[in-house]
Amino acid sequence: MVTLSDRFVGSDLKTSGYPWWAGNARLINLSGKLLGAHVAHAGLIVFWAGAMTLFEVAHFTPEKPLYEQGDILLPHLASLGWGVGPGGEITDITPYFIVGVLHLISSAVLGLGGVYHTLRGPETLEQYSDFFSQDWKDKNQMTNILGFHLIVLGIGASLFVFKAMFFGGLYDPWVPGGGGVRVITNPTLSPSVLFGYLFRSPFGGEGWLIGVNNMEDVVGGHIWVALHCFIGGAWHLITRPFNWARRSLVWSGEAYLSYSLGALSLMGFIASMFVWFNNTVYPSEFYGPTGSEASQAQSFTFLIRDQRLGANIASAQGPTGLGKYLMRSPTGEVIFGGETMRFWDFRGPWLEPLRGPNGLDLDKLNNDVQPWQIRRAAEYMTHAPLASINSVGGVITEPNSVNYVNLRQWLAGSHFILGFFFLIGHLWHAGRARAAAAGFEKGIDRKTEPVLSMSDLD
């Protein structure tokens, strides 16, 4: 029978109360080893990011848009303005290669740190310094840790702002002529504008946070986020929890886990909606069109085609009596006709130049349509996010896109699914933490676990 050395005391069922497959629960009271597990986990995440970036670089095809190549990381890098030319064309993949290599190097450092803290470092950080204490019931120390985390998040938001304002700028799909990289020189700082997004309706053209449609507001929002993170971090480092917080909150490792999972769930749901609906932060040049965008692109493409064949786009009627090409919205705005009228609230960089004060401008549609707008609409029309997340065939209207699944489906679907499971995890661990704090039984009796009645492997 294989025996474990003292090195693994606290890591098995007999010495920790948790079986080996219970993960980090075995390390609740071993802060040093718990740090090692977290650092190693970070190394795995960074390794995936680097390896996947290099994989996408190795398979990159210049003739195809990113959303046709199944890439999920290069679009993020392109949105930051690296290697992108006018119209969202990828002109240089060297920055992507460098980013991938830097992530691989970073993952090696993190991996070594994880191994060190798991095998060689002190089992509890308190042995090294009280500054790194992780006593879950030490309320003052827990708020210190929260403060440091907020400051790190503030640094991350600040780096985004610096990139936008001082280090090359960001890709802006609203640059005239089809999009381009530009430096954001005048970010929005007005609190009434930025915090006004929080009070918008989530429906129709309002779109709550997801309705942001200019890079000035995006960068300005990150400035405010960074400022709040820095102020909040300093506050939690300087102050001690108020009495109401000491009494009302549960102070335990599992409670902190539940709080974190709840926050991740919220961010997952918001990210899902951003990916699915927003074409400013997630440019369609890299991620493919949104559902409403593909629908409007189809109407626009057929309008241009039939107009060139002699159709009167202003008066033609469809089989239902509605305008075949153009009609009026419930508010009187001129919109595309037919089935796509349900998406009349859509706003896109390729379509907005054709609007006037009362909606789509007939004179502009007759005389001012540019070739790049026609090409983009035709491309978006055939790349609608209509397949399922596990589809391999897409939809039948995609003659030039074999096995195509719109990137927005992958990213929005995965973030929504992960957000849902994080929410379940939040509720599960919150219930366990509250039960433990109340002093009654939680979870399942370990005596009933089948694995405990099984024979040894050897």
From Swiss-Prot:
GO terms for molecular function: chlorophyll binding; electron transporter, transferring electrons within the cyclic electron transport pathway of photosynthesis activity; metal ion binding. Gene3D superfamilies: photosystem ii from thermosynechococcus elongatus. InterPro entries: PS_antenna-like, PS_II_antenna-like_sf, PSII_PsbC, PSII_PsbC_sf. GO terms for cellular component: photosystem II; plasma membrane-derived thylakoid membrane. Its main location: membrane. This is Photosystem II CP43 reaction center protein. Keywords: Chlorophyll, Chromophore, Manganese, Membrane, Metal-binding, Photosynthesis, Photosystem II, Thylakoid, Transmembrane, Transmembrane helix. Signal peptide: none annotated. The chain crosses the membrane at residues 54-78, 119-140, 163-185, 240-260, 276-297, 432-456. NCBIfam families: psbC. One of the components of the core complex of photosystem II (PSII). It binds chlorophyll and helps catalyze the primary light-induced photochemical processes of PSII. PSII is a light-driven water:plastoquinone oxidoreductase, using light energy to abstract electrons from H(2)O, generating O(2) and a proton gradient subsequently used for ATP formation. Belongs to the PsbB/PsbC family. PsbC subfamily. [CaMn4O5] cluster binds at E352. The gene is psbC. It comes from Prochlorothrix hollandica. GO terms for biological process: photosynthetic electron transport in photosystem II. Binds multiple chlorophylls and provides some of the ligands for the Ca-4Mn-5O cluster of the oxygen-evolving complex. It may also provide a ligand for a Cl- that is required for oxygen evolution. PSII binds additional chlorophylls, carotenoids and specific lipids. The keyword Manganese applies. PSII is composed of 1 copy each of membrane proteins PsbA, PsbB, PsbC, PsbD, PsbE, PsbF, PsbH, PsbI, PsbJ, PsbK, PsbL, PsbM, PsbT, PsbX, PsbY, PsbZ, Psb30/Ycf12, peripheral proteins PsbO, CyanoQ (PsbQ), PsbU, PsbV and a large number of cofactors. It forms dimeric complexes. It comes from the Bacteria. It is a multi-pass membrane protein.
